[in-house]
Structure formats: C-alpha cells, structure tokens
Amino acid sequence: MKVNKLKGKIVENGMSNPQFAEAIGMNYSTLLRKFKAPEKITCVEAEKMRIALNLKADEATEIFLA
C-alpha cells in the first residue's frame, strides 16, 4: 500500500486522519498502526477506504496493490 498517496487522498477529501478512521469504522490508533505496517491491511479494510474516499478502480489499484 502506498501510504503517502492514501494520506493525500484523505486530505483531498477534506478529512483528518481521525475523521477518516471513524468513516471506515476503525479506531484511530489502529489506523496509525496500519499506516506503519501497510502490508497488514485486509481486503475488507481496503474496500472500506476506497468507498470512504470515493476512489476510482484505477486509483484504488495504484494505492492498495502497488
């Protein structure tokens, strides 16, 4: 996962990290751990993030599968 691209999309969508965590139903501290260990993100979590950020398929692929 490209953490910096994901963080950029969070900002582009006018959210803070705590707001994003709430939007995807994740504890803020858990989100921070996911940022530090991006290989531990699940498919379900990636899909929730994609939906919360209104990412197109190609954007999601670039962020989560790179």
Residue ranges and their predicted role:
Residues 1-15:
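A short, Lys/Arg-rich alpha-helix, primarily the initiator
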Residues 9, 23, 34-35, 63:
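Residues in the recognition helix of alpha-helical DNA-binding motifs
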Residues 10, 21, 50:
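The alpha-helix within a helix-turn-helix
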Residues 14-33:
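Short alpha-helical DNA-recognition segment
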Residues 38-51:
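Short, basic-rich loop-to-helix N-cap that marks the start of a DNA-contacting helix
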Residues 54-66:
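Short C-terminal boundary/hinge segments that cap the last helix of small helical domains
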